[in-house]
Amino acid sequence: MAQAAGVRRQLDSLTRNIFLRDVGRTVPEKSGAPLTGDSEVAPSVSLQIFLYFNAFYFPFWWVCYVIMLQLKYVLLPDYYKFILVVLLILMSVIEVIRLYLGYSGNLQEKVPELAGFCLLSILLQLPLLLFLLCDPGLEPLPLERAVHGILTAFLLIQIPISIFALRKATRHLAGRFHLLGDLDGRA
């Protein structure tokens, strides 16, 4: 019996080292106290800062995009007119959803929302912005290049930061799951 308890302690120590190496403790170690609903949430401050600035920059980008579209609308072929209007609507909807998912996923440490933010950023928003920046048929104006470039820079900075925040949140939740399983086994 004492040997089984020693093996259990060794396994417990090993799993704590593997799963909880860089995760803050959410319950007191070896206390046997019941786990309360309170948990430590550790959002990424750098991601939150860039989301904050992006939320304030997006209306400015939108107004500039609409003004530039109105200025060059008569010069564009019909298919580019259609593409640019659809892109404006699509990017506006995607950006609002993306910022909401980023805020809620980061602040509340919700992994699905943070993953959705990453996927929307990488798969939809970045290709659309690169199309607006790089297609010469759109006849981009200098102001357009500048505002699209700034939004692309925000996006290129947010993508790796959000991936690291997602990894951190996943590790944190895995550690909490491990602790819950460990506490249930002792009761």
UniProtKB/Swiss-Prot annotation:
The lineage of its organism: Eukaryota, Metazoa, Chordata, Craniata, Vertebrata. This is Transmembrane protein 17A. The keyword Membrane applies. Keywords: Cell membrane, Cell projection, Cilium, Cilium biogenesis/degradation, Membrane, Transmembrane, Transmembrane helix. The chain crosses the membrane at residues 49-69, 82-102, 114-134, 146-166. Transmembrane component of the tectonic-like complex, a complex localized at the transition zone of primary cilia and acting as a barrier that prevents diffusion of transmembrane proteins between the cilia and plasma membranes. Required for ciliogenesis and sonic hedgehog/SHH signaling. Belongs to the TMEM17 family. The keyword Transmembrane applies. It is a multi-pass membrane protein. GO terms for cellular component: ciliary membrane; ciliary transition zone; MKS complex. It is found in: Cell projection, Cilium membrane. One of its GO terms (biological process) is cilium assembly. Part of the tectonic-like complex (also named B9 complex). It comes from the Eukaryota.
